Amino acid sequence: GLLLEGRDGGPTDAAAAQIKGPSIQEWAREGVLANMDDVAKAEKWDELLPKAIADGLKYKGNYVAAPVNVHRVNWLWANPEAFKKAGAKLPTTWDEFFVAAEALQKAGTIPVAHGGQNWQDFTTFESVALGVGGADFYKKALVQLDAGSLKSPTMDKVLATFKKVKTYTDKNAPGRDWN
């Protein structure tokens, strides 16, 4: 089991830890997370949080974790100086992305800094699927594994877009770590 100790080596009354996802349930089963329903009620978590987030913070119907942030990996990091040098604008669509990528490449900048580890490829693929197909398609194809969505023209477009994104990485990308 899990045992949290204070400075004196004995059990502690209070502790904080960054835990998320299924780990919240595991820690709660160990009995080391406090009931936070009073705080949740006072701060109106049930009204403010999406149900999926609220459910993940609860164990047996009680809040046992606080909603500190929601982290996504589908961010686009851009270098404004490189865009300025290339005469490109920050994209908001995939079509704009490819126009900008072409301009960056012509200006001598590698448009997509990307390693080739599996998790990086899948993260990029997820972002493309969401951007090309939208939230409903993403959920059907990648969460529910709906055969119709997986074999659809939208998935064909996702795959073609992903393949095109990869052409804007450098040849040394495969296997490179993210940092």
Where are these regions (language model features)?
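Short helix-initiation/N-cap motifs at beta->coil->alpha
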Residues: G1-L2, W94-V99, P174-N179
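Early extracytoplasmic/lumenal segment of secretory-pathway proteins
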Residues: G1-P22
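Hinge/lid segment of periplasmic solute-binding proteins
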Residues: K20-N74, F98
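Stable alpha-helical elements in mature extracytoplasmic
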Residues: K20-S23, V32, M36, N79, ...
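Short, solvent-exposed loop/beta-turn-alpha elements that line the ligand-binding surface or hinge
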Residues: D37-L49, V132-K157
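Extracytoplasmic/periplasmic solute-binding protein
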Residues: Y59-V68, N74, F98-A147
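Aromatic-glycine-rich donor-binding/catalytic loop that engages nucleotide-sugar donors
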Residues: P80-P91, T167-Y168
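Glycine-centered hinge/linker elements that transmit conformational signals in sensory
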Residues: A101, Q144-W178
